[in-house]
Amino acid sequence: MMRMIAEDYLHYVLDLWFERVVKPRLRGEACMVRYIDDFVLCFQFRSDALRAQEALAKRLSKFSLTLEPMKTKLVEFGRFAHRHASKRGRKRPETIYFLGFTMYCTRNQKGNFRIGMRTEKSRLRRALMRLQDQMRRMRHLSIREQMNLLNQMLRGHYAYYGIAGNIQALQRVHRAVEHYWRKMLSSRSWKGTVCWEQFQRIKEQFPLLRPKLYLPYRELQAIAIL
C-alpha cells in the first residue's frame, strides 16, 4: 500500500509536471524514464537540460524532497558524444547507471550509434556474493535439489539481466556458479576434491541453465522506436 501511495505521489510531483510544465517550455525534444524513485531525464539540447535541472530542484523542494547528489549528474549521451569527448581529452563518453545497468555509448557493426548495456559492477559483485551465500546454505541438500535451486536463481538473474550486449556478464555469473558448486561438492565429499572430470559428469546428469538473452537487439530496438 505504501508503495502505491509513493507511486501516485511521484506521478503528480514528477510525471505530470514534466509533461505539462517542463516539456512545452523546451527548445527541443525530451523524455523521462522512471521506475519508482529512480529516473532519467533525456534532452535533445544541453541548454534544456540545464534549465530543467534547476527547475527540478525547485520543484522537489516544494514537497520537501531532494535529489541524491551521488546519483545525480549531467551526462552527454548520444551519437555525438564520442566526438565531443575526444575534443575534451577523454577516451570515451561518460556512462549512466540505472536500475542495475551501466549504459554506455557504442557503435554497431555498421558504425552507427547504439546504446550499450551491461550489468553494473557493484550489482554484479553483490549478485555473486548472494549466490555464494545461498549455496553455503544448500550444501546439505541432494545434488538434484541443489541443481533445481541453482537453476531457479540463474533463471531469475538471466530474466532481469539477459539483455542484448550483456552476455559476457551472464557468462561470468554462470562460470562463478559452476566454480562455487564444484567447491561446495568437494567440501562435503569424503573422497576429497571433486575433479573436473567428475564434475563434468555431474553437470551432464544435472545440467545448469546456460546464459540466455531474453531481450535481443532486434526486440530492444523495436521497444526504443515505440
What role is predicted for each listed range?
Residues 1-226:
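Non-catalytic terminal/accessory segments
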